[in-house]
Amino acid sequence: MHIMEGYLPAIWCIVWFVVSIPVVAYGVYKLNKLVKEERGILPVLAVAGAFIFVLSSLKMPSVTGSCSHPTGTGIGAIIFGPAITAVLSTIVLIYQALFLAHGGLTTLGANVFSMGIVGPIVAYLIYKTGMKAKLNFYLIVFLAATLGDWATYIVTSTELALAFPAGDILTFGGFFSSFSKFVAIFAITQVPLAIVEGAVSALLFKYIIQAKSDLLVEMKVIGEPLVRKLRGLPA
Protein backbone atom coordinates (compact mmCIF):
# COMPACT_ATOMS: atom_id res chain seq x y z
CA MET A 1 0.00 0.00 0.00
CA HIS A 2 2.87 2.38 0.76
CA ILE A 3 3.46 4.37 -2.43
CA MET A 4 7.21 4.72 -2.78
CA GLU A 5 9.25 7.93 -2.67
CA GLY A 6 9.15 10.02 -5.84
CA TYR A 7 6.56 7.87 -7.59
CA LEU A 8 3.59 10.26 -7.64
CA PRO A 9 3.57 13.46 -9.73
CA ALA A 10 4.14 16.59 -7.64
CA ILE A 11 0.58 17.87 -8.07
CA TRP A 12 -0.89 14.71 -6.54
CA CYS A 13 1.62 14.77 -3.68
CA ILE A 14 0.37 18.27 -2.87
CA VAL A 15 -3.30 17.31 -3.20
CA TRP A 16 -3.03 14.42 -0.74
CA PHE A 17 -1.03 16.50 1.74
CA VAL A 18 -3.69 19.21 1.65
CA VAL A 19 -6.45 16.67 2.21
CA SER A 20 -4.65 14.81 5.01
CA ILE A 21 -3.17 17.63 7.10
CA PRO A 22 -6.49 18.90 8.62
CA VAL A 23 -7.46 15.39 9.75
CA VAL A 24 -4.07 14.73 11.33
CA ALA A 25 -4.11 18.15 13.01
CA TYR A 26 -7.53 17.40 14.51
CA GLY A 27 -6.20 14.02 15.62
CA VAL A 28 -3.28 15.68 17.43
CA TYR A 29 -5.77 17.91 19.26
CA LYS A 30 -7.91 14.92 20.29
CA LEU A 31 -4.85 12.90 21.31
CA ASN A 32 -3.51 15.66 23.55
CA LYS A 33 -6.92 16.04 25.16
CA LEU A 34 -7.25 12.29 25.74
CA VAL A 35 -3.79 11.91 27.29
CA LYS A 36 -4.38 14.84 29.66
CA GLU A 37 -7.69 13.38 30.80
CA GLU A 38 -6.59 9.75 31.10
CA ARG A 39 -2.86 9.00 31.51
CA GLY A 40 -3.66 5.35 32.05
CA ILE A 41 -4.53 5.00 28.38
CA LEU A 42 -0.87 5.32 27.31
CA PRO A 43 -0.13 1.54 27.39
CA VAL A 44 -3.13 0.83 25.15
CA LEU A 45 -2.09 3.69 22.87
CA ALA A 46 1.38 2.15 22.63
CA VAL A 47 -0.07 -1.27 21.79
CA ALA A 48 -2.24 0.22 19.02
CA GLY A 49 0.72 2.12 17.56
CA ALA A 50 3.01 -0.91 17.74
CA PHE A 51 0.36 -3.06 16.07
CA ILE A 52 0.16 -0.62 13.15
CA PHE A 53 3.96 -0.50 12.86
CA VAL A 54 4.53 -4.26 12.95
CA LEU A 55 1.75 -5.25 10.57
CA SER A 56 2.36 -2.46 8.05
CA SER A 57 6.07 -3.34 7.94
CA LEU A 58 5.33 -6.86 6.66
CA LYS A 59 5.42 -5.85 3.01
CA MET A 60 5.04 -8.06 -0.06
CA PRO A 61 5.69 -7.20 -3.74
CA SER A 62 2.60 -5.97 -5.59
CA VAL A 63 1.72 -3.05 -7.88
CA THR A 64 4.71 -1.19 -9.33
CA GLY A 65 5.50 1.74 -7.03
CA SER A 66 3.62 0.19 -4.12
CA CYS A 67 3.36 -3.04 -2.10
CA SER A 68 0.93 -5.20 -0.15
CA HIS A 69 0.80 -5.61 3.62
CA PRO A 70 -1.67 -5.60 6.52
CA THR A 71 -2.40 -2.12 7.90
CA GLY A 72 -3.12 -2.76 11.57
CA THR A 73 -5.28 0.35 11.90
CA GLY A 74 -8.54 -1.37 12.83
CA ILE A 75 -7.69 -1.75 16.53
CA GLY A 76 -6.75 1.92 16.86
CA ALA A 77 -9.88 3.05 15.04
CA ILE A 78 -12.15 1.00 17.31
CA ILE A 79 -10.55 2.19 20.54
CA PHE A 80 -9.48 5.77 19.78
CA GLY A 81 -11.47 6.73 16.68
CA PRO A 82 -10.25 7.62 13.18
CA ALA A 83 -8.63 10.98 13.99
CA ILE A 84 -6.22 9.70 16.64
CA THR A 85 -5.49 6.63 14.51
CA ALA A 86 -4.51 9.02 11.71
CA VAL A 87 -1.85 10.47 14.04
CA LEU A 88 -0.54 7.03 15.00
CA SER A 89 -0.41 6.04 11.32
CA THR A 90 1.41 9.25 10.38
CA ILE A 91 4.09 8.63 13.01
CA VAL A 92 4.54 5.06 11.75
CA LEU A 93 4.65 6.13 8.10
CA ILE A 94 7.26 8.83 8.78
CA TYR A 95 9.47 6.37 10.66
CA GLN A 96 9.14 3.75 7.91
CA ALA A 97 9.93 6.30 5.19
CA LEU A 98 13.03 7.60 7.00
CA PHE A 99 14.52 4.39 8.37
CA LEU A 100 13.04 1.43 6.47
CA ALA A 101 12.83 2.79 2.90
CA HIS A 102 9.16 1.87 3.08
CA GLY A 103 6.93 4.53 1.49
CA GLY A 104 8.29 8.05 1.18
CA LEU A 105 8.14 11.63 2.39
CA THR A 106 6.80 13.11 -0.86
CA THR A 107 4.09 10.44 -0.92
CA LEU A 108 3.38 10.71 2.81
CA GLY A 109 0.12 12.60 2.27
CA ALA A 110 -1.22 9.92 -0.06
CA ASN A 111 -0.18 7.10 2.26
CA VAL A 112 -1.66 8.83 5.31
CA PHE A 113 -4.94 9.42 3.47
CA SER A 114 -5.36 5.78 2.45
CA MET A 115 -3.95 3.94 5.48
CA GLY A 116 -4.36 6.52 8.23
CA ILE A 117 -7.65 8.19 7.35
CA VAL A 118 -10.00 6.26 5.05
CA GLY A 119 -9.13 2.79 6.37
CA PRO A 120 -9.74 3.78 10.02
CA ILE A 121 -12.95 5.63 9.14
CA VAL A 122 -14.34 2.52 7.45
CA ALA A 123 -13.24 0.30 10.36
CA TYR A 124 -14.83 2.68 12.87
CA LEU A 125 -18.13 2.82 10.97
CA ILE A 126 -18.23 -0.97 10.64
CA TYR A 127 -17.61 -1.31 14.37
CA LYS A 128 -20.37 1.16 15.31
CA THR A 129 -22.81 -0.44 12.87
CA GLY A 130 -22.03 -3.94 14.14
CA MET A 131 -22.49 -2.88 17.77
CA LYS A 132 -25.88 -1.35 16.99
CA ALA A 133 -26.87 -4.55 15.20
CA LYS A 134 -25.75 -6.53 18.29
CA LEU A 135 -23.53 -8.90 16.30
CA ASN A 136 -20.96 -11.11 17.98
CA PHE A 137 -18.32 -8.73 19.35
CA TYR A 138 -15.26 -10.50 17.97
CA LEU A 139 -16.96 -10.87 14.59
CA ILE A 140 -17.44 -7.10 14.60
CA VAL A 141 -13.74 -6.54 15.31
CA PHE A 142 -12.83 -9.01 12.55
CA LEU A 143 -15.07 -7.29 10.01
CA ALA A 144 -13.90 -3.81 11.01
CA ALA A 145 -10.23 -4.69 10.61
CA THR A 146 -10.74 -6.66 7.39
CA LEU A 147 -12.96 -4.14 5.61
CA GLY A 148 -10.85 -1.23 6.83
CA ASP A 149 -7.82 -2.90 5.24
CA TRP A 150 -9.64 -3.44 1.95
CA ALA A 151 -10.81 0.18 1.96
CA THR A 152 -7.19 1.29 2.29
CA TYR A 153 -6.23 -0.59 -0.87
CA ILE A 154 -9.23 0.65 -2.81
CA VAL A 155 -8.12 4.20 -1.99
CA THR A 156 -4.50 3.43 -2.90
CA SER A 157 -5.72 2.06 -6.23
CA THR A 158 -7.69 5.28 -6.71
CA GLU A 159 -4.62 7.41 -5.93
CA LEU A 160 -2.49 5.47 -8.41
CA ALA A 161 -5.20 5.53 -11.09
CA LEU A 162 -5.64 9.29 -10.74
CA ALA A 163 -1.89 9.80 -11.09
CA PHE A 164 -1.44 7.30 -13.91
CA PRO A 165 -4.66 6.95 -15.95
CA ALA A 166 -4.57 4.66 -18.98
CA GLY A 167 -5.80 7.54 -21.15
CA ASP A 168 -7.30 11.00 -20.77
CA ILE A 169 -8.38 11.32 -17.13
CA LEU A 170 -11.01 13.88 -18.09
CA THR A 171 -12.98 11.16 -19.88
CA PHE A 172 -12.83 8.88 -16.79
CA GLY A 173 -12.28 5.91 -19.10
CA GLY A 174 -8.54 6.04 -18.51
CA PHE A 175 -9.03 6.31 -14.77
CA PHE A 176 -11.38 3.33 -14.51
CA SER A 177 -9.15 1.22 -16.74
CA SER A 178 -6.14 1.86 -14.50
CA PHE A 179 -8.19 1.54 -11.31
CA SER A 180 -9.52 -1.89 -12.24
CA LYS A 181 -6.00 -3.14 -13.00
CA PHE A 182 -4.54 -1.82 -9.75
CA VAL A 183 -7.39 -3.29 -7.68
CA ALA A 184 -7.11 -6.67 -9.42
CA ILE A 185 -3.37 -6.90 -8.72
CA PHE A 186 -3.73 -5.79 -5.11
CA ALA A 187 -6.56 -8.29 -4.55
CA ILE A 188 -4.27 -11.28 -5.18
CA THR A 189 -2.35 -10.63 -1.97
CA GLN A 190 -4.59 -8.25 -0.05
CA VAL A 191 -7.76 -10.31 0.19
CA PRO A 192 -6.09 -13.10 2.20
CA LEU A 193 -3.83 -10.68 4.11
CA ALA A 194 -6.83 -8.64 5.27
CA ILE A 195 -8.64 -11.76 6.46
CA VAL A 196 -5.60 -12.78 8.51
CA GLU A 197 -5.36 -9.23 9.88
CA GLY A 198 -9.00 -9.39 10.94
CA ALA A 199 -8.42 -12.63 12.84
CA VAL A 200 -5.26 -11.31 14.55
CA SER A 201 -7.06 -8.08 15.47
CA ALA A 202 -9.88 -10.02 17.12
CA LEU A 203 -7.34 -12.03 19.14
CA LEU A 204 -5.49 -8.88 20.21
CA PHE A 205 -8.73 -7.23 21.26
CA LYS A 206 -9.51 -10.28 23.38
CA TYR A 207 -6.21 -9.70 25.22
CA ILE A 208 -6.91 -5.97 25.65
CA ILE A 209 -10.32 -6.74 27.16
CA GLN A 210 -8.69 -9.05 29.68
CA ALA A 211 -5.94 -6.55 30.56
CA LYS A 212 -7.49 -3.08 30.23
CA SER A 213 -11.26 -3.50 30.08
CA ASP A 214 -11.78 -0.74 32.67
CA LEU A 215 -10.26 1.84 30.31
CA LEU A 216 -12.37 0.61 27.40
CA VAL A 217 -15.51 1.02 29.51
CA GLU A 218 -14.41 4.46 30.69
CA MET A 219 -13.81 5.56 27.08
CA LYS A 220 -17.21 4.13 26.11
CA VAL A 221 -15.66 1.78 23.57
CA ILE A 222 -17.60 -1.09 25.09
CA GLY A 223 -20.18 -1.38 27.87
CA GLU A 224 -19.61 -3.02 31.26
CA PRO A 225 -22.28 -5.75 30.74
CA LEU A 226 -20.65 -6.87 27.49
CA VAL A 227 -17.19 -6.83 29.10
CA ARG A 228 -18.42 -9.12 31.86
CA LYS A 229 -19.97 -11.43 29.29
CA LEU A 230 -16.79 -11.55 27.19
CA ARG A 231 -14.69 -12.26 30.28
CA GLY A 232 -17.03 -15.02 31.38
CA LEU A 233 -18.08 -13.20 34.56
CA PRO A 234 -21.60 -13.22 36.04
CA ALA A 235 -23.83 -10.34 34.89
Curated annotation (Swiss-Prot):
Recorded topology in the membrane: Multi-pass membrane protein
HAMAP family named in the record: CbiM
Gene3D superfamilies for this protein: 1.10.1760.20
Record keyword Cell membrane present: yes
Keyword set, alphabetical order: Cell membrane, Cobalamin biosynthesis, Cobalt, Cobalt transport, Ion transport, Membrane, Transmembrane, Transmembrane helix, Transport
Pfam families named among the record's database cross-references: CbiM (PF01891)
Compartmental location: Cell membrane
Main function: Part of the energy-coupling factor (ECF) transporter complex CbiMNOQ involved in cobalt import.
Single GO BP term: cobalamin biosynthetic process
Pathway: Cofactor biosynthesis; adenosylcobalamin biosynthesis
InterPro entries for this protein: CbiM, CbiM/NikMN
Subunit structure: Forms an energy-coupling factor (ECF) transporter complex composed of an ATP-binding protein (A component, CbiO), a transmembrane protein (T component, CbiQ) and 2 possible substrate-capture proteins (S components, CbiM and CbiN) of unknown stoichimetry.
GO molecular function: cobalt ion transmembrane transporter activity
A single cellular component GO annotation: ATP-binding cassette (ABC) transporter complex
Entry keyword annotation includes Cell division: no
Membrane-spanning ranges: 8-28, 40-60, 74-94, 107-127, 135-155, 160-180, 185-205
PANTHER family: COBALT TRANSPORT PROTEIN CBIM, PTHR43627
Family: Belongs to the CbiM family.
Protein name from the UniProt record: Putative cobalt transport protein CbiM 2
Signal peptide: none
